[in-house]
């Protein structure tokens, strides 16, 4: 149980990244979350001034990629078929990067939850843009969670990133592929963009077992996700007991959110918040495009604040109906168990 309410880190500069015509990744996403959080009593909004420097971005991304973004964002352009830029994109992206880093600084100081409202999102952006052979950047510019994780490495032996966005965090995984100090656990829908995240993708030669992919079939449910969390994530958190848990918080696995085919409800997000209540949390916004933005973020924070009540009233998810998910989880435990003596 935490002592104070979660804090939401925000800077209106992130609204400056705008499409010319309708695009699912638009400023309304952040405003929807803000309004929903406030209406549910989460109104501790912290305005973070300023933005990161180009040199900070170059700690994560290649020079060629960063300067291509700088040049393209001088006017309205497309980096690829999915990812637009405008004359305020660079400032928005540098601001988002700073929000993520400020969140982890605060979380390392106080054992509470800090939720950075970052956009453009970041987890698909790899070292040089498109990551692990993906066809596009998937709306992402700079990898915000990677910036937070790199900073956290200065204070922690092991950094744990949990990504529950419905799309695989291929950029994050590429950036830390050979880094055995960063454990990246990724929940995602199998067979959709970016087409990465197989259970056999476990990290580079010196980092095998630190990249943990959980590819779920379409229409997976709260029960499926909770089962996987209890079987895989919980033992890892218990073993490493990190000073802060980094979360790539995408809400597009929510049922009918629009860009995927998952059937999650508030139950899973409330469960995750409750399970993380014993830790400080650095949450960084990734995806979520419609209904998920309204209902999932307040559920996530509510679980963190009211953990005991949430977990005491949770249904028994030790048994699930999906043989596909049970098999996937069993195989992941077997593969990762060869490198991490946890399961």
Swiss-Prot record:
Pfam families, A to Z: Hist_deacetyl
UniProt-listed GO biological process terms: epigenetic regulation of gene expression
Disulfide bridge positions per record: none
Homology family: Belongs to the histone deacetylase family.
Source organism of this protein record: Methanocaldococcus jannaschii (strain ATCC 43067 / DSM 2661 / JAL-1 / JCM 10045 / NBRC 100440)
UniProt xrefs under SUPFAM superfamilies: Arginase/deacetylase
Gene3D superfamilies: Histone deacetylase domain (3.40.800.20)
Domain of life: Archaea
Keywords per UniProt: Hydrolase
An annotated Gene Ontology molecular function: hydrolase activity
The protein's role, per its UniProt record: Putative deacetylase.
Protein name in UniProt: Uncharacterized protein MJ0535
């Amino acid at each position: 149980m935490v002592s104070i309410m979660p804090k939401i880190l925000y800077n209106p500069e992130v609204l400056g990244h705008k499409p010319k015509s309708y695009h699912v990744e638009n400023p309304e996403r952040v405003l929807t979350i803000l309004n929903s959080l406030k209406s549910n009593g989460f109104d501790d909004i912290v305005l973070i001034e300023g933005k990161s420097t180009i040199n900070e971005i170059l700690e994560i991304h290649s020079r060629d990629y960063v300067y291509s973004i700088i040049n393209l964002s001088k006017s309205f352009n497309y980096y690829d078929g999915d990812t637009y830029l405008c004359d305020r994109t660079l400032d928005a992206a540098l601001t988002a990067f700073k929000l993520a880093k400020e969140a982890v600084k605060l979380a390392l100081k106080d054992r509470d939850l800090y939720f950075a409202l970052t956009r453009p999102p970041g987890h698909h952006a790899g070292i040089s843009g498109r990551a692990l052979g993906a066809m596009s950047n998937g709306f992402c510019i700079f990898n915000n969670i990677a910036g937070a994780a790199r900073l956290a490495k200065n204070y922690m032996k092991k950094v744990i990133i949990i990504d529950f966005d419905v799309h695989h965090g291929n950029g994050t995984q590429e950036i830390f592929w050979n880094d055995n100090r960063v454990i990246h656990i990724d929940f995602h829908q199998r067979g959709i963009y970016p087409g990465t995240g197989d259970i056999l993708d476990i990290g580079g030669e010196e980092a095998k077992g630190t990249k943990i992919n959980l590819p779920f079939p379409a229409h997976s449910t709260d029960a499926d996700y909770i089962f996987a969390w209890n079987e895989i994530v919980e033992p890892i958190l218990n073993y490493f007991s990190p000073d802060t848990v980094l979360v790539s918080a995408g809400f597009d696995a929510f049922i009918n959110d629009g860009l995927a085919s998952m059937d999650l409800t508030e139950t899973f997000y409330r469960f995750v918040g409750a399970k993380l209540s014993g830790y400080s949390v650095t949450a960084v916004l990734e995806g979520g495009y419609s209904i998920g933005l309204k209902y999932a973020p307040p559920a996530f924070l509510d679980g963190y604040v009211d953990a005991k009540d949430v977990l005491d009233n949770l249904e028994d998810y030790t048994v699930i109906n999906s043989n596909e998910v049970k098999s996937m989880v069993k195989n992941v435990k077997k593969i990762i168990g060869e490198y991490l003596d946890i399961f």
